[in-house]
Amino acid sequence: MPEAGLAEAFGVTEEARAKINLALHVTGQRPDGYHLLEMLVTFADCGDRLGFLPAQADAFTLSGPFGAMLAGDGNNLVLRARDLLREQVGALAFPVHIHLQKNLPIASGIGGGSADAAATLRGLMRLWGMDLPAETLASLALTLGADVPMCFESRPLIARGIGEKIEAVPDLPAFAMVLANPLKGVSTPEVFRRLAAKNNPALHLARSLSATSDWLTAIGSARNDLEPPACELVPEIAMISQMLQAQGALITRMSGSGATCFGIFSTMTAAQEAAAALHGERPDWYVQATETVSGGM
């Protein structure tokens, strides 16, 4: 469904922006098995879109290039978010038709499902006229998944713990970027299992960062600790980084547990040209030129 069509057909719409891990440091592991992370996160202008409309009975419909992959999944995060919020608000939660325009690859390291869940919480709160306390929303979001609280914010941030400790980063600038994914699945549990070390150095960012060049230097000196084991599972990840570098990317890195990689470029024109070249070489991959949001939004 085109963007204009979604806005016309549904009274409330929400963007589910792609989540980009500019840095992901694995710094430890809790007794319950969850890994401790320190992440610098931003969000892209591209992503999924959702529409919400009052209905006689609950309905869920799909469109978009990756929508068919979710068909028949009655336990996806959108429906879980709807049901969880309904339990919280009770009788005020009338039946709703939710439409998901699935533009992002499934399980690709850029928070698609988590962003959809967060957008569902935001959209249904608007549709149902709800205004829940921040701590209640944070608890609901974390119940849905470790990435959902940061996707609910959808702005540049540092996340720690398992992702629930969030600190805004108002000085992070916008970046011209290319996202690329070979459309091969990566098992997140297997990536963590293959980690060579689980107590890696913490993420350190100077408090005085302001210029874009300073941020690029800081991001360049950071890392994604999940990238080496993910490359063992999907060698195309390393290939993507090499191809982005060949197109002039200033920084390349994998996002999340993969397999999406990003390249930061000096201008949006350079990013668009690189995306076109990459798509020409690998038309079977997901390739998207985009711009990330700034901390000032």
Curated annotation (Swiss-Prot):
GO terms for biological process: isopentenyl diphosphate biosynthetic process, methylerythritol 4-phosphate pathway; terpenoid biosynthetic process. Gene3D superfamilies: 3.30.230.10, GHMP kinase, C-terminal domain. It comes from the Bacteria. Its EC number is 2.7.1.148. SUPFAM superfamilies: GHMP Kinase, C-terminal domain (SSF55060), Ribosomal protein S5 domain 2-like (SSF54211). InterPro entries: GHMP_kinase_C_dom, GHMP_kinase_C_sf, GHMP_kinase_N_dom, IspE, Ribosomal_Su5_D2-typ_SF, Ribsml_uS5_D2-typ_fold_subgr. It is an enzyme of class 2 (transferase). Pfam families: GHMP_kinases_C, GHMP_kinases_N. Disulfide bonds: none annotated. One of its GO terms (molecular function) is 4-(cytidine 5'-diphospho)-2-C-methyl-D-erythritol kinase activity. Pathway: Isoprenoid biosynthesis; isopentenyl diphosphate biosynthesis via DXP pathway; isopentenyl diphosphate from 1-deoxy-D-xylulose 5-phosphate: step 3/6. The active site is at K19, D147. It catalyses: 4-CDP-2-C-methyl-D-erythritol + ATP = 4-CDP-2-C-methyl-D-erythritol 2-phosphate + ADP + H(+). ATP binds at P105, I106, A107, S108, G109, I110, G111, G112, G113, S114, A115. The keyword Mitochondrion does not apply. Keywords: ATP-binding, Isoprene biosynthesis, Kinase, Nucleotide-binding, Transferase. NCBIfam families: ispE (TIGR00154), PRK14608.1 (NF011202). Belongs to the GHMP kinase family. IspE subfamily. Catalyzes the phosphorylation of the position 2 hydroxy group of 4-diphosphocytidyl-2C-methyl-D-erythritol. This is 4-diphosphocytidyl-2-C-methyl-D-erythritol kinase. The lineage of its organism: Bacteria, Pseudomonadati, Pseudomonadota, Alphaproteobacteria, Hyphomicrobiales. The gene is ispE.
